[in-house]
Amino acid sequence: MDGLLIDSERLMWTESMRIAAKEQGHTMSDEFHHTFMGRNLNSVGDILRKEYGPEFDYDIFLKRCYEINDTILSKGIPLMKGAKQLLDYLKESGIYTCIGTTTHRRQTTALLTANKMLEDFDDIVCGDEVSIGKPNPEIYLKCLSKFKDVDKSEALVFEDGNAGAHAGIDSGMRLVLVPDLAYLDDEVRSKAYKIIPDLSKAIDFIKEENERTTSI
């Protein structure tokens, strides 16, 4: 969701984490932030404590991030290119949709509500609703389980982040990679079913896939 559908990774999380780290006397570079984008919050805590030392208070850091995010969100966060058109097409076509996001339910609901997108999805699975976050595939397998008549071979996972991309690959579903800010390793690039520059290219791709599968 963050950085794929909504430009919240760039405009919200990058800024809030930078400020929250600075308040504890640390500098967070964009390059360092990009290395853990999309990972579950427990993993992020481990990474930050290793980087900043045992005195780093991750609970305070995370609380401040949410406070800063709420302030930024109140001013509005734009959608990523092609996101609205894609969601409209999927709904009109009767194609099931489910968000699998590391972001917790409270912030997810706020983001989607602010952008009038909450009703665009059949279901949502958030980071605080799985036992193991990305890059573990649990979140995407839980998304798939919401639709009893859909096999994983029929499902597409759209991802912009490295951790989420690995989760998509390991889920057994087909990964559609939409690169944005996050570092993407050679494995996810080589194993991606499709790489598109932004979501404006997704509709044509899905139409082509439907034509291909129905002609087999």
Predicted segment positions?
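Alpha-helical elements of Rossmann-like donor-binding domains used by nucleotide-donor carbohydrate transfer enzymes
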Residues: 14-15, 43, 47, 64, ...
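Short, flexible loop segments at the rims of nucleotide/cofactor-binding pockets, characterized by
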Residues: 74-78, 102, 172
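Conserved phosphate-coupling serine/threonine residues in phosphotransfer and NTP-handling enzymes
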Residues: 4, 101-103
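Asp-based, Mg2+/Mn2+-dependent phosphohydrolase catalytic module
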Residues: 88-91, 104-216
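Hydrophobic/aromatic residues within well-ordered alpha-helical segments
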Residues: 12, 37-41, 61-69, 104
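Helix-loop "lid/cap" segments that line or gate small-molecule binding pockets
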Residues: 17-22, 40-55, 111, 143-146
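Active-site neighborhood of HAD-like aspartate-dependent phosphohydrolases
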Residues: 1-34
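Metal-dependent phosphoesterase signature
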Residues: 23, 27-28, 47-85, 93-95
